[in-house]
């Protein structure tokens, strides 16, 4: 998504080794939600995993996530149990956001929910069929209504640097 690091080159190398790995790259930052939607459009597999590239989400959970899909869940999502390592002001505003959203919305938005999740093709197709222009995926995941298994883990420190403007933009 307009990243200036070496992520795109690394993904291209992975694609050379495994054609199931694909890169969706943009010339500029188009925003998280639009980037997620573009990734869903590109994904063709029976299962789709979504995770941040900054390693805050433990890839080691994938086998466990897949085992729950095999047990019949449509989606396996993750949430952090603490906000350890996060700036206190960001934690405060995040908690307030979830509290307010859950008061005014009929769709539950899980506090601490991460974008890291594994979904069946049916879930992804349902999301893609929505005509929403301004998307909020955490709300959409709840709204489409598929059975979701939640896995919890401790918050990890991001390998990217957060700046004050980034905190306010997020």
Predicted regions located by residue number:
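A conserved acidic beta->alpha catalytic loop
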Residues: 1-9, 55-56
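Acceptor/aglycone-binding surface of glycosyltransferases and processive sugar-polymer synthases
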Residues: 13, 20, 24-28, 32-42, ...
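Short, conserved catalytic or interaction motifs in soluble domains
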Residues: 28, 53-55, 153
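Short beta-strand-to-loop acidic/aromatic patch adjacent to the donor-nucleotide binding site
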Residues: 46-54
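Short beta-strand and adjacent tight-turn residues that come in two discontinuous sequence segments
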Residues: 50, 78, 151
